[in-house]
Amino acid sequence: MRCVPVFIILLLLSPSAPSVDAHPKTKDDVPLASFHDDAKRTLQRLWIKALCCYGYRFCCPNFR
């Protein structure tokens, strides 16, 4: 069980390989980078909100 935290830390520290598109892009293709950026931004916002609002509702920016 002592190896599990070490494995998780190494997994988080390892750089991810860049994605390679198998198909050439055409003018009709929507760039996936914008989708990835939007998803990443949304997940970061939800993560920050979850950390902030978990025990301290007064620090939550959308708390009403």
Curated annotation (Swiss-Prot):
Propeptide, chain numbering: 23-48
Q: Where in the cell is it found?
A: Secreted
Q: Which UniProt keywords apply?
A: Cleavage on pair of basic residues, Disulfide bond, Secreted, Signal, Toxin
Q: Name one Pfam family in it.
A: Chi-conotoxin
Quote the PTM field.
Answer: Contains 2 disulfide bonds that can be either 'C1-C3, C2-C4' or 'C1-C4, C2-C3', since these disulfide connectivities have been observed for conotoxins with cysteine framework V (for examples, see AC P0DQQ7 and AC P81755).
For this UniProt entry, which residues form the secretion signal? 1-22
Cellular-component GO terms for this entry: extracellular region
Q: In which tissues is it expressed?
A: Expressed by the venom duct.
Annotated GO molecular function terms are: toxin activity
Q: Please give the record's comment on domains.
A: The cysteine framework is V (CC-CC).
- UniProt record similarity statement: Belongs to the conotoxin T superfamily.
What name does this protein carry? Conotoxin LiC121
Q: Write down the species.
A: Conus lividus
